């Protein structure tokens, strides 16, 4: 680490990879999405071609909710955490899947599923 001082290199933990994942918007199965989410909710809809012929799950994908979306959030005064409710005009519109303090932004960041 002595050699890295000129480059402002510091030690860190594996937790820093989680922060970078959130900053980059890289999803983690089991944290940001699970078997109850559909590809459209978590930003993977561009990989689904509903105009193709038959494929397993197509009928279900034609009827799923496309009004919930995963968004990155930046919080001014708090560090968000999993399950944090998101309000708009006193109504719950979503919840946070993951959160952390971002040294890059100097603020709390997270990913949230929000009903639009």
Spell out what each predicted region is.
Residues 3, 20-21, 35, 89:
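Arginine residue identity/basic-tract feature
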Residues 12-14, 37-114:
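Glycine-rich, small/acidic residue-mixed loop/short-helix segments
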Residues 1-4, 23, 83, 96-97:
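A generic alpha-helix structural signal
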Residues 1-16:
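Internal alpha/beta scaffold segment
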Residues 14-32:
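Short, conserved secondary-structure transition motifs
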């Amino acid at each position: 680490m002595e050699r890295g001082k000129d480059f402002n290199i510091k030690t860190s933990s594996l937790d820093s990879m989680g922060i970078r994942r959130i900053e980059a918007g890289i999803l983690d199965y089991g944290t940001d999405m699970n078997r109850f989410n559909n590809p459209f909710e978590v930003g993977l809809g561009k990989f689904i071609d509903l105009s193709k012929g038959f494929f397993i799950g197509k009928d279900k994908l034609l009827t799923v909710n496309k009004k919930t979306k995963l968004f990155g959030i930046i919080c001014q005064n708090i560090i968000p955490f999993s399950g944090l409710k998101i309000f708009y005009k006193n109504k719950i519109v979503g919840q946070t899947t993951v959160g952390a303090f971002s040294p890059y932004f100097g603020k709390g960041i997270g990913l949230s599923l929000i009903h639009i």
